[in-house]
Amino acid sequence: ELGAQLRFAPGERAYNGREGKNSLFNLSKDAPVFKLSHQMGLKNVLGGDFNYNHTEISAEKRIWLSSFGHIDALVTAGKVWDKVPFPLLIMPNTNQSITIQPQAFNMMRALEFVSDQYVSFYFTYYMKGWILNRIPGVKWLRLREVISFSGFYGGLTDKNNPALDPTGLYRFPEGTSPMGRTPYLE
């Protein structure tokens, strides 16, 4: 598999870590970040079984709401351009643990939906104690409010649907299906 990624973040300032240039990190998420990535699978190259092309584009931004906290927003879209078996299709990132995982769907089952083209969004509002700090006796706990809203909408073309074109495709596991016309929201 070969891959390339372009990243554009106007106004971002990177800082060196302990290992010098090889450990750059960003202290601020105020600058918008735009990414374009492409992965290519090559059949018969380094043991590759399939030719495929997968493209993703994303935009990420932190929106400050003064003393009311901030919203982290991420919008992503992607497409698989070729006929591929289901392990190479797009499956939304799911969270099966009890901890909060960024950019993951907490209520969706693993392998519930597959698609070869999709758009998703993740909005997380960090209220920084705006409500809980006003409740007497609770402020000393330093609890913070986090509200998230996420969505995923994808489609599966006929060439990648084993129910319509079974030649060369694996059947979906039980409980896995293409998305219908309704987006998934949580």
List each language-model region with its residue ranges.
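Exposed, low-structure sequence patches enriched in small/polar residues
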Residues: 1-186
